[in-house]
Swiss-Prot record:
Origin: domain of life: Viruses
Protein name, entry field: Protein UL17
Taxonomic source organism: Human cytomegalovirus (strain Towne)
Similarity comment: family membership: Belongs to the HHV-5 UL17 protein family.
Alphabetical list of Pfam families matching this protein: UL17
InterPro entries in the record: Cytomegalovir_UL17 (IPR020527)
Length: 104
C-alpha cells in the first residue's frame, strides 16, 4: 500500500497531495491524516540485504586514469584563472583613470 501511494508522487511536485480513501474508523479529526502527506516521508520497502562478504567492483584503470588527469587539468585551470587573470582585449568601458587627453 505504501509503495503504491509513493508511486503516485513520482514526477509530481512536492506539494501535490492525494486524498486517500480511509475507512471511517481510521479517520481522525485532523485533516492532514486523510492525505498521503505524512506517509510520503516513509522509506520505500527495502530489499533483503545480500548476505556474505561484498567486494567493491573494480574501477577500470583507464577510467580511473582519466579521472585523475581531469582532476589535475581542472586544478591547473583554476590556478591559472586565479593567479594569472586574462587581460581584457576589448574593455567595455574605457578606464576612467586614463583620460583620452593624457594619451595625446
Amino acid at each position: 500500500m505504501d509503495h503504491a501511494l509513493f508511486t503516485h508522487f513520482v514526477g509530481r511536485p512536492r506539494h501535490c497531495r492525494l486524498e486517500m480513501l480511509i475507512l471511517d474508523e481510521q479517520v481522525s479529526k485532523r485533516s492532514w491524516d486523510t492525505t498521503v502527506y505524512h506517509r510520503r516521508r516513509r522509506h520505500l520497502p527495502r530489499r533483503r540485504a545480500p548476505c556474505g562478504p561484498q567486494r567493491p567492483a573494480e574501477i577500470p584503470k583507464r577510467r580511473k586514469k582519466a579521472a585523475v588527469l581531469l582532476f589535475w587539468h581542472d586544478l591547473c585551470w583554476l590556478f591559472r584563472r586565479l593567479f594569472f587573470p586574462r587581460e581584457d582585449s576589448e574593455p567595455l568601458m574605457s578606464d576612467p583613470a586614463r583620460s583620452p587627453e593624457e594619451e595625446e
